[in-house]
């Protein structure tokens, strides 16, 4: 059930995950039933409200993986156990589990919705090969979790300080030939997702991506997350099969807080 009205949630834990990234664990006033790939709106009184992907836990206590990039997320980093925030949701469509072999591709904090997805896939006895990429060794969020949950984990860094030097898509090209996966899942920078979609299409592998766009209302009203062709990230996504995104603004036009093209 979606909570349209914000409800209070207590901060249970706020831990530093890696450089400029935290994991916030919250206990809402009442359980929120969510699925991997869905998101909520996180509000801090007197500050702002932002969309955040569910990143672990369960209905009664869940985690959010948050990159520190501005005033709101800096305030998130200052939260302490016992503090109260506001949440509403869940919103959006989740990932779909299919097949017996999957490749999961994460770029930076795009890993957030993929951690619970990998956990769900393993419970469904799906063989999971994960790829996690970041700029350098200190910016690989949830690496330990992915390593524990996945059958195999490949790491890439742009500077070569850990794992393979390069990008997650460099590894993906090899994996789709080696692993012959039934499906590819991905979340991260949109440029990366475009390349993931291209590789999956070239090898005729179904692919779901979680698209990150500016989301203001979460309820399909404001239009700030419009993708064209009548699609809204908050209502029709954030998870899409890549064929749904053909002919849209995905990989091209971006929109500002008002929904106007930038």
Curated annotation (Swiss-Prot):
A GO term, aspect molecular function: metal ion binding
Keyword DNA-binding listed: no
SUPFAM superfamilies: Ferredoxin reductase-like, C-terminal NADP-linked domain (SSF52343), Riboflavin synthase domain-like (SSF63380)
InterPro entries per the UniProt record, alphabetical: Cyt_c3_hydrogenase_gsu, Dihydroorotate_DH_Fe-S-bd, Dihydroorotate_DHASE_ETsu, FAD-bd_FR_type, FNR_nucleotide-bd, OxRdtase_FAD/NAD-bd, PyrK_electron_transfer, Riboflavin_synthase-like_b-brl
Pfam families according to UniProt: DHODB_Fe-S_bind, NAD_binding_1
Cofactor annotation: [2Fe-2S] cluster; FAD
Organism domain of life: Archaea
The keyword rRNA-binding is annotated on this UniProt entry: no
Pathway where it operates: Pyrimidine metabolism; UMP biosynthesis via de novo pathway; orotate from (S)-dihydroorotate (NAD(+) route): step 1/1
Residues covered by the FAD-binding FR-type domain: 4-97
Manner of cofactor binding, per the entry note: Binds 1 [2Fe-2S] cluster per subunit. Binds 1 FAD per subunit.
Alphabetic keyword roster: 2Fe-2S, Electron transport, FAD, Flavoprotein, Iron, Iron-sulfur, Metal-binding, Pyrimidine biosynthesis, Transport
Binding, [2Fe-2S] cluster: 217, 222, 225, 234
Protein's GO biological process: 'de novo' UMP biosynthetic process
Complex formation: Heterotetramer of 2 PyrK and 2 PyrD type B subunits.
Function description: Responsible for channeling the electrons from the oxidation of dihydroorotate from the FMN redox center in the PyrD type B subunit to the ultimate electron acceptor NAD(+).
Similarity section: Belongs to the PyrK family.
Protein name as it appears in the record: Probable dihydroorotate dehydrogenase B (NAD(+)), electron transfer subunit
Organism: Methanopyrus kandleri (strain AV19 / DSM 6324 / JCM 9639 / NBRC 100938)
Designated gene of the protein: pyrK
């Amino acid at each position: 059930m979606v909570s349209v009205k914000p409800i209070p949630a207590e901060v249970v834990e706020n831990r530093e995950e890696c450089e400029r990234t935290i994991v916030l664990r919250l206990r809402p006033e009442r359980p929120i039933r969510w699925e991997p790939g869905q998101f909520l709106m996180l509000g801090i009184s007197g500050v702002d409200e932002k969309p955040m992907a569910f990143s672990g836990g369960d209905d009664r206590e869940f985690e959010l993986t948050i990159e520190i990039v501005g005033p709101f997320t800096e305030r998130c980093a200052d939260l302490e156990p016992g503090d109260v925030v506001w949440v509403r949701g869940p919103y959006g469509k989740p990932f779909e589990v299919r097949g017996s072999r999957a490749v999961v591709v994460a770029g930076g904090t795009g890993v957030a919705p993929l951690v619970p997805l990998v956990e769900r896939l393993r419970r469904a006895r799906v063989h999971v090969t994960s790829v996690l990429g970041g700029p350098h060794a200190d910016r690989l969020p949830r690496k330990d979790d992915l390593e524990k949950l996945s059958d195999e984990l490949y790491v890439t860094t742009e500077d070569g300080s850990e794992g393979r030097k390069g990008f997650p898509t460099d590894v993906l090209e090899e994996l789709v030939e080696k692993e012959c996966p039934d499906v590819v899942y991905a979340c991260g920078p949109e440029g990366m997702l475009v390349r993931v979609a291209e590789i999956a299409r070239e090898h005729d592998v179904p692919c779901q991506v979680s698209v990150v766009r500016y989301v203001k209302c979460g309820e399909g009203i404001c239009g700030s997350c419009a993708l064209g062709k009548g699609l809204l990230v908050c209502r029709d996504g954030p998870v899409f099969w890549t064929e749904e995104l053909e002919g849209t603004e995905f990989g091209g036009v971006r929109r500002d807080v008002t929904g106007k093209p930038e």
